Amino acid sequence: MLNATTLVHAGRPRTLVHPGAFNPVRIQARHSPGARHLRLCLQPGRSLFDALVQPLQAMGICSASTTILGGDFDHFVYCVATPDATGRALIAYSQPLSAGPAALVFGNATLGKRQDGSPIVHCHAAFRTGSGQMRGGHVVTEACIVGPAPIAVLVTSLDGFELRVAFDPETNIPLLQPLSEEHHV
């Protein structure tokens, strides 16, 4: 019997079956007539969220794709994906886990807007804990504090459309989705 967490092996490696209606269009794409590429330095002592959002908003960037090139954090908090106990979705995030001081090896973060229009940063990263263990997961950006040295981030603005959290009927969870300019609030 198949359920939301069943892995199907039909001639392909590990196919995950989401509980909602299947959407044959896997990538929702939008065209942008232009984009800005820049390098940003996250400032020490600030949360990852504030260090990323505030300077980008000051430049008029509300949606972006970023690559965090690595650096030290005085405090690092993350979650991991666990099976959703309710069965409504494939996964749910664990309770936040504190790694204490950590060295981010590499991460990707997406800047967009919540349903109410406030900023959101969705970030996944690989990092090394103070005891040397390698970990990875969903980063709680508001709780991660940049360490003593600035951290370099490569930014590509997504001009001409925005990323906004909206309910996804296939996964049954809210996801960042591209919306064209006429949908901007």
Which residues does each PLM region occupy?
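N-terminal, Lys/Arg- and Ser/Thr-rich interaction peptides
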Residues: L7-R36
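Structural beta-strand/beta-sheet cores of well-ordered domains, especially the beta-sheet scaffolds
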Residues: R36-L38, C62-A64, C123, A149-I151
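Flexible, glycine/proline-enriched loop segments at strand-loop-helix junctions
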Residues: R36-L42, V139
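Short, well-structured hydrophobic secondary-structure segments
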Residues: C41-G107
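Long, charge-patterned amphipathic alpha-helical coiled-coil/hairpin "stalk" segments used as oligomerization
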Residues: A92-A152
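Mixed-charge, glycine-accented linear interaction segment located at domain edges/termini
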Residues: R128-V185
